[in-house]
């Protein structure tokens, strides 16, 4: 039987004796207790020793408990300072009184009457005071001290180790206790010394221990792949705040304040407000009567106070329109991959927060065909060979479309919405050319790419799944 040098040392230390405490064995071997226990377990796995485990409770004083063991409990110290009686106003000047007064009354050591504290006759030393000198686990006094944070009860595990019949036989047959050599030097090889050295044996039939390095989360890998793809296609990335006022999240995108279109997404509303940007009056006029766009608008009233109210962004289109307002001149190609928030019921296909890819392209002479062509190119590079389009509706685009991709086993899967921004959206910011816009649920793209059936798995803290996921290279 192949044994390591430390396993042999354990067997040798047990020769000629019965069960031996691990502490005694460690002292005899001049080794750390934890190491000896580990080596003994290895011997036990090979049937050479037995281990008997015993768990006992030990009580030890905390730092505060040690202090009171020397000075006395707070109630005893206060009691000793009272000469028969004392006004409560004087007693409370002692810092210990905050702790002691309650215990003095609980132990019936004092009586308080008309603001005077009187010492009672029976103030004998209590069980808790005796236990403070020698706490015994499980006793009422020890439990009381533990509640006061003066005693800590800990479990101590001890081991007894003994040779089995097989272990005793191997030990008596003789053990080579020379240190095994794991690495040979050049001199040992050239001189032939290696032939007489006790070489450490290796099991070549055992798989090595897996080493897990740092890993990028599988979902993040796909987000990075999408980001790199759009960079290759000439896009610029933009960012924005999670918290948006209703003006940018709804009003600037031609969603009326008193219309069901505003309820298309259930929203997380916040108590805070943010100011409206310069030029907000143009949005007001467009909502009320169409402004100078030729539209009739929504009619009715429009409140700037409603526009100031904050929400967690329900879509990243709010970032797109802000970016366009800051960059109104064509040509422009930009995108954002952002977390958005909606009051969804959690199920395998819906979460209250998820990543959305938002993109915009602005240039003269752009038309709807360019938008469809972009999707075919983009999804093709993402590995979806078949793409089709269905008519859609969004308050801020016209015409609107919903792209779908074919997934084996699932059929056609809708991945987002797109269209050309309406004049009511772009005109207030001085934009007079077409703007192609889209928003895609990239969390769903990740889910399809990885073959998942439950969207929640993308965000679970499952380290084994992350380790087992293939590394994706863009």
Curated annotation (Swiss-Prot):
Protein's cellular compartments: Cytoplasm
UniProt main location, coarse: cytoplasm
Organism in which the protein naturally occurs: Methanocorpusculum labreanum (strain ATCC 43576 / DSM 4855 / Z)
Residues bound to Mg(2+): 398
CDD domains cross-referenced by the UniProt entry: PheRS_alpha_core
SUPFAM superfamilies documented for this protein: Class II aaRS and biotin synthetases
Protein name: Phenylalanine--tRNA ligase alpha subunit
Residues binding L-phenylalanine: 317, 356-358, 396, 421
GO biological process terms held by the UniProt record: phenylalanyl-tRNA aminoacylation
């Amino acid at each position: 039987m192949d044994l390591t040098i430390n396993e042999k040392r354990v067997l040798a230390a047990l020769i000629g004796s019965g069960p031996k405490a691990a502490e005694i064995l460690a002292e005899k071997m001049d080794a750390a207790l934890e190491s000896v226990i580990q080596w003994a377990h290895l011997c036990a796995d090979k049937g050479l020793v037995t281990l008997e485990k015993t768990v006992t409770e030990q009580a030890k004083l905390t730092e505060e408990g040690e202090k009171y063991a020397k000075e006395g409990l707070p109630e005893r110290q206060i009691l000793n300072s009272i000469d028969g009686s004392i006004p409560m106003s004087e007693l409370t000047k002692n810092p210990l009184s905050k702790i002691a007064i309650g215990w003095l009354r609980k132990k019936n050591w004092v009586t308080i009457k008309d603001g005077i504290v009187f010492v009672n006759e029976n103030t004998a030393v209590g069980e808790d005071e005796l236990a403070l000198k020698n706490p015994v686990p499980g006793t009422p006094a020890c439990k009381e001290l533990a509640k006061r944070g003066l005693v800590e009860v800990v479990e101590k595990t001890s081991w007894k180790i003994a040779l089995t019949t097989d272990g005793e036989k191997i030990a008596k047959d003789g053990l080579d206790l020379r240190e095994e050599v794991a690495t040979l030097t050049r001199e040992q090889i050239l001189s032939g010394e290696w032939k007489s050295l006790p070489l450490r044996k290796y099991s070549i039939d055992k798989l090595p221990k897996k080493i897990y390095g740092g890993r990028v989360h599988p979902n993040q890998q796909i987000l990075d792949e999408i980001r790199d793809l759009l960079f290759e296609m000439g896009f610029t990335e933009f960012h924005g705040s999670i918290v948006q006022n209703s003006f940018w999240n709804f009003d600037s995108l031609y969603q009326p304040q008193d219309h069901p279109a505003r309820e298309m997404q259930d929203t997380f509303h916040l108590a805070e407000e943010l100011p409206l940007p310069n030029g907000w009056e143009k949005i007001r006029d467009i909502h009320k009567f169409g402004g100078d766009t030729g539209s009739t608008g929504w009619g009715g009233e429009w409140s700037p106070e409603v526009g100031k109210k904050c929400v967690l962004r329900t879509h990243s289109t709010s970032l797109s329109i802000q970016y366009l307002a800051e960059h109104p001149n064509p040509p422009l190609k930009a995108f954002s991959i952002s977390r958005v928030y909606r009051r969804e019921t959690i199920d395998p296909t819906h979460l209250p927060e998820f990543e959305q890819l938002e993109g915009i392209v602005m240039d003269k002479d752009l038309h709807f065909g360019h938008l469809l062509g972009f999707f075919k190119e983009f999804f093709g590079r993402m590995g979806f060979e078949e793409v089709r389009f269905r008519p859609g509706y969004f308050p801020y685009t016209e015409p609107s479309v919903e792209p779908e991709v074919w997934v084996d086993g699932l059929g056609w899967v809708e991945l987002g919405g797109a269209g050309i921004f309406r004049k009511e959206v772009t005109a207030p910011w001085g934009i007079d050319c077409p703007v192609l816009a889209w928003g895609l649920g990239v969390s769903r793209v990740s889910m399809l790419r990885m073959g998942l059936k439950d969207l929640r798995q993308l965000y679970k803290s499952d380290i084994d799944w992350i380790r087992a996921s293939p590394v994706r290279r863009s």
